[in-house]
Amino acid sequence: MDLCQVFLTLALAVTSSTFSGSEATPATLGKASPVLQRINPSLGTSSSGKPRFTKCRSPELETFSCYWTEGDNPDLKTPGSIQLYYAKRESQRQAARIAHEWTQEWKECPDYVSAGKNSCYFNSSYTSIWIPYCIKLTTNGDLLDQKCFTVDEIVQPDPPIGLNWTLLNISLTGIRGDIQVSWQPPPNADVLKGWIILEYEIQYKEVNESKWKVMGPIWLTYCPVYSLRMDKEHEVRVRSRQRSFEKYSEFSEVLRVIFPQTNILEACEEDIQFPWFLIIIFGIFGVAVMLFVVIFSKQQRIKMLILPPVPVPKIKGIDPDLLKEGKLEEVNTILGIHDNYKPDFYNDDSWVEFIELDIDEADVDEKTEGSDTDRLLSNDHEKSAGILGAKDDDSGRTSCYDPDILDTDFHTSDMCDGTLKFRQSQKLNMEADLLCLDQKNLKNLPYDASLGSLHPSITQTVEENKPQPLLSSETEATHQLASTPMSNPTSLANIDFYAQVSDITPAGGDVLSPGQKIKAGIAQGNTQREVATPCQENYSMNSAYFCESDAKKCIAVARRMEATSCIKPSFNQEDIYITTESLTTTAQMSETADIAPDAEMSVPDYTTVHTVQSPRGLILNATALPLPDKKNFPSSCGYVSTDQLNKIMQ
């Protein structure tokens, strides 16, 4: 099949030589060329030894030029031996139809000189944009090569011109620098009016390198190049192309960039690059390993820091198992033993300030005989107005020096000074007679007659002078003093100030059980008056403290009585202070030794516990007296402790 086509082509070529005239040859070639291209595209051009088109380009989209080669035939190297014919078509459809009909007229190249050797130049008058062109090469009527295109497809601008560079910056080490390369667009491209739009590509490298570094495409006519070695020479070149096309122009002239000379040592230091990346990697790995080791070794402590344990309830001296098992009795026992856990009952229980009883005179002896009421309340308290229980800011007890009552109308007897002096003088006068009485005479004589006849001043002193409250600067609780006239003075030695606890109040106080009655020793009449001993004159029975002067007098009396009774007083070392009752008992032991206990006397009834002195001892709250109408100011006196009193008694 292919051989038949070749023979047909040769036959047509031979027959074409029989026609004469110059116009017949192009027409025949025009008819034969499309047929050859349709039959075999490889036959569109002659063999490699024949002339052919190399390129067609339009630098500014206004003109274009086409170039070809001479071939191997020496006859074709002579000028004018090869001709270029072109043909314009109105449109692609019309061009295809005309080419198919073989009726289009071909025109020869208008200029073989302007574009150079073996070229054809088409100026603006022969150039039409967006209109297809077809060109062909012939020699002596023979078709050498053929090509069709449009002008906008063959645009290939000229290279940029006027390359230059400017130093922008130098690094702190002085080893690298930044430059800016600038250029001008091709002079024949109408870039300013926008007829053609160009984009550029810049390439640079060191002189001794073979590979170029590419930057682009760039629309501007300048471009910065960063981090160039200042100790090396660099080459820069630029080329351009129409936007959205693939064909670049030729490269511009190479621009050499030479920096000023720099220190060679600095360049060497720059060449030695420190492996910062590896150091960072190994550093992070080492820190992670250290953290893992620390967390693994201290995991218990870290766990306690993050999640601290819940503290177990714990009381010092108490087993927590007792609280868990609910053994509250044992816990209360432990709390009672330790002083730190003792409750302050005085904060919860209010003290009794005074007790008022409405008792008929006829029933006084019957109801109050042998009871605590005889000691707490008496007719002398109601009649007397010289007893004052004033609270001192420092000690909590009564004081004659309270500034709030300095302007009070004093009693006419001047209880703080006159009464005390009068009593002291009476005691000095009666002391010798009272202590020198014969024990036998005291036993034989009636009590009222002996004391009333021998010492009438004693009864008068007791009736007129009420017991004064004693001062204390070291006690915490405020105690009001009370006078306790009793039918028999010997019963004072047998009164108990401690009793058994029978119940506990909700506020924390203890209720004592009533005590059993005891023998008093001497029958008491309903109309008998109480006769005070020398040691009872200057202090009250209910007072928890005593004055130093009164103590010395009582001790002197007790020593005189030791000669007859041979009874030596003793004081408990556990007590912090000596109570008035103990002194009274010691002073009266000689008088009560020979008296037979015939009468019965009851111990104190009910009261509240002030504090726990020992596991088996309770200190009771004293009963306060009602405040009188007028204030009396007792004189101040010192206090004697247990050790001091024992030394004096020895």
UniProtKB/Swiss-Prot annotation:
Motif (UbE motif): 349-358
Motif (WSXWS motif) on chain: 248-252
Topological domains annotated Extracellular: 25-273
Biased composition (Polar residues): 470-486
UniProt key word Iron: no
One Gene Ontology term, aspect cellular component: nucleus
Origin superkingdom: Eukaryota
Residue numbers spanned by region Required for JAK2 binding: 303-390
Biological process terms in GO annotation: endocytosis; growth hormone receptor signaling pathway via JAK-STAT; regulation of multicellular organism growth; taurine metabolic process
Tissue expression remark: Expressed in all tissues tested including, liver, heart, adipose tissue, mammary gland, testes, ovary, brain, kidney and muscle. Highest levels in liver.
Regions of this protein lying in the Cytoplasmic compartment: 298-650
Modified how: The soluble form (GHBP) is produced by phorbol ester-promoted proteolytic cleavage at the cell surface (shedding) by ADAM17/TACE. Shedding is inhibited by growth hormone (GH) binding to the receptor probably due to a conformational change in GHR rendering the receptor inaccessible to ADAM17. On GH binding, phosphorylated on tyrosine residues in the cytoplasmic domain by JAK2.
Disulfide bonds: 56-66, 109-120, 134-148
Phosphotyrosine found at: 498, 606
Domain remark in the UniProt entry: The WSXWS motif appears to be necessary for proper protein folding and thereby efficient intracellular transport and cell-surface receptor binding.
Oligomer status and interactors: On growth hormone (GH) binding, forms homodimers and binds JAK2 via a box 1-containing domain.
UniProt protein name: Growth hormone receptor
Gene source species: Mus musculus
